[in-house]
Amino acid sequence: MAKAAVTKRHHFMIQKLLILLSYGYTNGLDDAHSLRCNLTIKAPTPADPLWYEAKCLVDEILILHLSNINKTMTSGDPGETANATEVGECLTQPVNDLCQKLRDKVSNTKVDTHKTNGYPHLQVTMIYPQSQGQTPSATWEFNISDSYFFTFYTENMSWRSANDESGVIMNKWNDDGDLVQRLKYFIPECRQKIDEFLKQSKEKPRSTSRSPSITQLTSTSPLPPPSHSTSKKGFISVGLIFISLLFAFAFAM
């Protein structure tokens, strides 16, 4: 019993450190403007017919708020309304189609009933940094019921999971060619409009934000990609957290 408890605590600590590791990586990209879409898929109820909700933002500007019930598009600056509306309109159909696909996918995914209660709750985060003329690459982070975590990188069409249990589900999703294609071409469909809006945002200063707490990072931060250009700041963060991982493993022995 005691050994099992120590092992569980050890795994929990390693998971948190891995999440911080990914934040150290992405923190090095803070100077780049990016598009972020947050998708939520859940089971509808008679009292709440909402089964999906999507929000897409460029930095702090909400450009699309979409659900199976209604749609709104907003811009924080009247001067950006036209461009924000164009991006939002372009993303509307891909977002709607993808959420429908994800709903079907998660409903057919077998999960440990001890970890989930009823219909699995899916959270997806897509991050697309300004491409600057390069091949557009996006990161897709998947969180099923705060228990299964994996990430897809369109840059090299690779997947990474947080643990073996997540890997089982991840491999099945990877075998779904239609899903993979939707993830791959989500950005290219609207790339020109998105890049133009990101370029416009680049000319304006960004507001700084504090580093998120460990609880905020749990369900939204990706694992670091297998290969990617990273700034010096990102490398320093990764190095420090890697040392922490070594200490964690040493204490667990």
UniProtKB/Swiss-Prot annotation:
Residues cleaved off as propeptide: 228-253
Lipid sites, type GPI-anchor amidated serine: 227
Any one GO cellular component localisation term in the record: plasma membrane
One Pfam family this sequence matches: MHC_I_2
InterPro entries: MHC_class-I_related, MHC_I-like_Ag-recog_sf, MHC_I/II-like_Ag-recog, RAE-1
Biased composition (Low complexity): 211-221
Residues making up the signal peptide according to the UniProt record: 1-28
The protein's role, per its UniProt record: Acts as a ligand for KLRK1.
UniProt record similarity statement: Belongs to the NKG2D ligand family.
Official protein name in the record: Retinoic acid early-inducible protein 1-gamma
Protein's organism: Mus musculus
Gene name tied to this protein: Raet1c
